[in-house]
C-alpha cells in the first residue's frame, strides 16, 4: 500500500542527492518515477533539481496553480513513485493533491524539504506535510559552526551578519543560509 513520506532536514542534509539516488534505484529496476520541484527555486534553472555535489536532473516545476494530481494521473505509463524536491514551498492544496495521489492512485509519494525557515517557523508546505504524511523521516547534518546536529537554518545578509526578520522565502544557497544547531542559531559565532 502506497504512503506519503515527508523526509525533512536542514540545509546540506542531502535531500536532493537522496532524490537522485531513489530515482536511480527505481529506474535501475525498470520502474518509472515522476520528479517535481518548486517553480520558485531558480538557483540553478527552473525545472531542474541540482545537488550541491553537482548532479542535476530535469523535474516538473510546481507553481501556485499547478495541479500535481492531474499531471500524475496523465503520465503514461503510470509512475511507480512520485518524488518532490523543495517541498517546503508547496501550498496546502498541493499537499492535499499528494495525499490524493497516494490514496486514489496507490502511488508512493516521497517529499523532501526543509521543515522550518530561518525564523524557526514552519513553511506552509512543511506544516501540511507534517500533518498529512504517513511517515516522517528526519535527514541529519551537522551544525556549520560546532558540529552538533543541525536542526535550524541561519540566514545571513550580504555582509555575513545573522538575519532573524524579513520575508520567509528568499532563494539562496550556502551564501545566505547555514545549517545550525539551536545554540548557534541564537548566538552564531560570526565575527
UniProtKB/Swiss-Prot annotation:
GO terms for biological process: DNA biosynthetic process; thymidine metabolic process. Its EC number is 2.7.1.21. InterPro entries: P-loop_NTPase, Thymidine_kinase, Thymidine_kinase_CS. It is found in: Cytoplasm. Zn(2+) binds at residues 143, 146, 181, 184. The active site is at 86 (proton acceptor). It is an enzyme of class 2 (transferase). Keywords: ATP-binding, Cytoplasm, DNA synthesis, Kinase, Metal-binding, Nucleotide-binding, Transferase, Zinc. One of its GO terms (molecular function) is ATP binding. It catalyses: thymidine + ATP = dTMP + ADP + H(+). PANTHER family: THYMIDINE KINASE, THYMIDINE KINASE, CYTOSOLIC. This is Thymidine kinase. It comes from Listeria monocytogenes serovar 1/2a (strain ATCC BAA-679 / EGD-e). The gene is tdk.
Amino acid at each position: 500500500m502506497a504512503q506519503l513520506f515527508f523526509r525533512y532536514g536542514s540545509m546540506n542534509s542531502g535531500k536532493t542527492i537522496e532524490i537522485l539516488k531513489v530515482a536511480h534505484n527505481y529506474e535501475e529496476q525498470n520502474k518509472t518515477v515522476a520528479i517535481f520541484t518548486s517553480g520558485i527555486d531558480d538557483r540553478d534553472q527552473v525545472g531542474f533539481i541540482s545537488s550541491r555535489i553537482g548532479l542535476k536532473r530535469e523535474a516538473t516545476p510546481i507553481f501556485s496553480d499547478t495541479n500535481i494530481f492531474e499531471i500524475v494521473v496523465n503520465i503514461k505509463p503510470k509512475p511507480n513513485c512520485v518524488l518532490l524536491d523543495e517541498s517546503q514551498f508547496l501550498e496546502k492544496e498541493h499537499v492535499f493533491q499528494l495525499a490524493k495521489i497516494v490514496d486514489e492512485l496507490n502511488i508512493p509519494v516521497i517529499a523532501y524539504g526543509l521543515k522550518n525557515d530561518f525564523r524557526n517557523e514552519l513553511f506552509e508546505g512543511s506544516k501540511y506535510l507534517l500533518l498529512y504524511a504517513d511517515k516522517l523521516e528526519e535527514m541529519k547534518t551537522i551544525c556549520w559552526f560546532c558540529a552538533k546536529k543541525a536542526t535550524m537554518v541561519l540566514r545571513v545578509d550580504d555582509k555575513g551578519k545573522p538575519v532573524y526578520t524579513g520575508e520567509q522565502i528568499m532563494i539562496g544557497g550556502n551564501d545566505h543560509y547555514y545549517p545550525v544547531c539551536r545554540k548557534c542559531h541564537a548566538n552564531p559565532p560570526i565575527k
